[in-house]
């Protein structure tokens, strides 16, 4: 199973290697975004953390928004590639569930921290609002196709209408934004998306992904 989950090494996701200075900016930004969210982090703070100049930053990016979009778009493609690889391996439902949980855990520990999720939910910048809305819709379309493929392979019950599965996937994000759940999961906010995914894959049974 692990071989299927890791069927695409992470280093193969990038189209081209980045220069050392650009990679330093990316890593500094990811660290700052993860701990503080991206909304309040300035270009100056990123440059300071990366030990580089603003001139160097603007050599690679028009502004902070461009860097934000690069990091999130890249992570989106990584997830897409891993799931497409998974389907190509003729995975079982258990393997699909294990991969989804593994990808989600990695996303929550590498990029989608609680401050980042809060910034996405309350984004005020119009450019980033359009970007994240577009990403969300792409995610829905891909996951609809992903679960439809599993259904065609008879891993998901054939009687479930695709529209119901699609609506359930969309409701997962709606649940993430419920204030009462945010309060309930405040001690461990990253547990909420895990429990929601668990509910989607296994319902109310006690079964869990290994």
Which residue stretches match the model-derived regions?
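Generic hydrophobic, amphipathic alpha-helix propensity
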Residues: 20-32, 46, 71-75, 79, ...
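Amphipathic, non-transmembrane alpha-helical scaffold segments
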Residues: 68, 72, 76, 129-140, ...
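Hydrophobic alpha-helical connector segments
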Residues: 70, 84-110, 169
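Short secondary-structure transition hinges
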Residues: 105-142, 152
């Amino acid at each position: 199973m692990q071989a299927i989950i890791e069927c695409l090494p992470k280093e193969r996701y990038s189209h081209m290697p980045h220069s050392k200075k650009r990679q330093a900016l990316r890593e500094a930004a990811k660290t700052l975004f993860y701990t503080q969210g991206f909304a309040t982090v300035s270009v100056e703070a990123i440059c300071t953390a990366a030990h580089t100049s603003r001139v160097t930053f603007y050599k690679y990016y028009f502004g902070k928004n461009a860097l934000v979009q690069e990091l999130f778009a890249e992570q989106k493609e990584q997830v897409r590639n891993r799931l497409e690889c998974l389907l190509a391996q003729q995975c079982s439902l258990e393997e699909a569930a294990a991969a989804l949980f593994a990808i989600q855990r990695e996303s929550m520990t590498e990029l989608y921290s609680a401050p980042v999720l809060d910034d996405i939910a309350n984004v005020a910048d119009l450019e980033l609002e359009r970007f994240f809305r577009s990403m969300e819709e792409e995610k829905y379309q891909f996951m609809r196709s992903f679960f439809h493929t599993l259904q065609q392979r008879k891993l998901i019950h054939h009687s479930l209408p695709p529209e119901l599965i699609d609506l359930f996937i969309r409701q997962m994000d709606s649940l993430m934004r419920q204030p009462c759940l945010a309060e309930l999961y405040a001690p461990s906010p990253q547990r909420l998306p895990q429990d929601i995914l668990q509910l989607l894959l296994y319902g109310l049974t006690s079964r869990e992904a290994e």
